[in-house]
Amino acid sequence: MTILFLTMVISYLSCMKATPMKEVSIRGQGSLAYPGLRTQGNLETLSGPNDATRGLTSLADTFEHVIEELLDERQVIQPSKENKDADLYSSRVMLSSQVPLEPPLLFLLEEYKNYLDAANMSMRVRRHSDPARRGELSVCDSTSEWVTAAEKKTAVDMSGATVTVLEKVPVPKGQLKQYFYETKCSTKGYAKEGCRGIDKRYWNSQCRTTQSYVRALTTDNKKRVGWRFIRIDTSCVCTLTIKRGR
């Protein structure tokens, strides 16, 4: 599904007339221990003529270029001299020497696509489609944040066994910390009363955190270290049960 999503985004962006960036510096390092982790694209320099429309088209070209780099499994990008530790991405998992400042790339791409859709609307349609103006609210409130392996400590793998999540991953230049981008139901506000918009006369509702599998460096109860798929919190959904006797 991830490859399909990236392919659709590339097709969408390729239809736009984008002005190439004058200079794009990308830093990163391929991971020998875990091929599934890809390098982070870092846009260091943006320069060019002062055109009101150039920023949007240049950004589209940049995203297309970054996606192509992420999809190229054979390419190994050498780290720059200024950054000895490369930040490595894999969906909701990241290896970095410091706490990530932004959500994973796929989340940013989704927000960017929504921005492009809004930019193509007229001002009147844009105001009408604004969720805040229509009074739209999510059924369940959720929170997302980066957590470290030190905070997770243990997790459940695909075989149902409990494994220990390693806090640091060895790399040629030292060690990097494992970070996980988790999404869970908010414990504040309306969530305690059930889901929004549900008729309580007929339905019992509850906001529940669901999990998905991501790959991480772990050790099992026999002290065997390896990359395994583990479960982390990835979404907040509304579950319904019909009230009896109605």
Swiss-Prot record:
Keywords, ordered alphabetically: Cleavage on pair of basic residues, Disulfide bond, Glycoprotein, Growth factor, Secreted, Signal
The protein's name: Neurotrophic factor BDNF precursor form
Signal peptide region: 1-18
SMART domains given in the database record: NGF (SM00140)
Superkingdom of the organism of origin: Eukaryota
Family: Belongs to the NGF-beta family.
Disulphide bond pairs: 140-207, 185-236, 195-238
InterPro entries: Brain-der_neurotrophic_factor (IPR020430), Cystine-knot_cytokine (IPR029034), Nerve_growth_factor-like (IPR020408), Nerve_growth_factor-rel (IPR002072), Nerve_growth_factor_CS (IPR019846)
Pfam families, alphabetized: NGF
Major place of residence: secreted
Its biological purpose: Promotes the survival of neuronal populations that are all located either in the central nervous system or directly connected to it.
Any one GO molecular function term: nerve growth factor receptor binding
List of glycosylated residues: 120
Listed PROSITE patterns: NGF_1, NGF_2
One GO term (biological process): cell surface receptor protein tyrosine kinase signaling pathway
Any Gene Ontology CC annotation: synaptic vesicle
Entry keyword Plastid: no
Propeptide part(s) removed at maturation, as residue ranges: 19-127
Species the sequence originates in: Ptyas major
Subcellular localization(s) per the UniProt record: Secreted
